A protein has these predicted regions:
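Bacterial signal peptide processing site
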Residues: 25-26
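N-terminal Rossmann NAD(P)H-binding glycine-rich loop of SDR-like oxidoreductase domains
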Residues: 34-60
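Active-site-lining helix/loop region of Rossmann-like oxidoreductase modules
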Residues: 29, 35, 46, 118, ...
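Bacterial N-terminal signal peptides
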Residues: 11-22
Length: 268
């Protein structure tokens, strides 16, 4: 009787050990699978022309999410591999789910104008989108533990009073949005392009500079998008602000290389 009891105990122990080892194996497999999956990047402003270029530049290296205000419009415009999240940068309570699990964020959001100084949406002002909206995004990124946030701003934001400022003080509010991101504590890169064009990327020289003292100029969206994507994983781009403008004397934006080498980190 004692032998049978001991044998039963041994068998029970063996069964428990087997279950434990199988559970550990399945957990390890799940972790390995998770580790091998591409990182998640959340794109804001994805339905715009610059946002579309960013999606293309991300390619297959990332699992891509897009924060959108209109799901039907986004489904019609965006690739099928983009996971859509309904939200509005003006309403911080709508941002949480899109940011959960995101490792990177790229924002090309901006107030949209129709005509000269006329807003497409009375509530789509530069103050509410380019400042308050970016501030909300930075707060959501901080809460979610985002590793790097790339913001597309505009060249000339520190030189107020120009023609663009006649449109709802756009440069003033973009600069405040930049400063809100800097103050958030989230690692960032701020990319300030010149006037955006839709020329083919990788064909014209591009100057990547600092100081916001470049003359007026154009930048094509594809090169801006490539620079944004490169900034996500380049340590030299951490907490850096750059201006980007076409310059025939400069090299084209390469598929790899040191775009951010030697640039100065922002001073708090």
């Amino acid at each position: 009787m004692r032998i049978q009891t001991r044998m039963g105990a041994v068998l029970a122990a063996l069964v428990l050990c087997t279950w434990f080892l199988m559970g550990c194996s399945q957990t390890a497999d799940a972790l390995d699978s998770s580790a091998s999956e591409p990182p998640v990047v959340l794109v804001i402003g994805a339905t715009g022309r610059t946002g579309n270029s960013i999606l293309a530049a991300l390619g297959d290296d990332y699992r891509i999410r897009a924060l959108v205000r209109d799901l039907d419009r986004a489904r019609a415009k965006l690739p099928a591999n983009v996971t859509l999240f309904l939200g509005d940068v003006r309403q911080p309570e709508t941002l949480t789910s899109a940011f959960e699990g995101a490792r990177f964020v790229v924002s090309a959001v901006g107030a949209r104008f129709v005509g000269k100084g006329d807003l497409a949406d009375p509530m789509n002002t530069t103050e509410l989108v380019d400042y308050e909206g970016v501030k909300h995004l930075a707060g959501a990124a901080r809460s979610a533990g985002v590793e790097h946030f790339v913001l597309v701003s505009a060249m000339g934001v520190t030189r107020l009073g120009g023609a663009h400022d006649r449109m709802d003080n756009i440069m003033h509010w973009k600069l405040k949005g930049e400063n809100a991101l800097r103050a958030s504590g989230v690692p960032y890169t701020i990319v300030r392009p010149g006037g955006l064009s839709d020329e083919a990327g990788g064909t014209l020289g591009t100057l990547v500079a600092q100081g916001d003292n470049q003359g007026p100029g154009q930048t094509n969206r594809i090169d801006v998008a490539r620079i944004c994507v490169r900034a996500l994983t380049d340590p030299a781009a951490r907490n850096v602000t750059v201006e980007v403008v076409k310059d025939a004397s400069q090299p084209v934006v390469p598929p790899d290389g040191d775009i951010f080498a030697g640039l100065k980190v922002d001073v708090p």
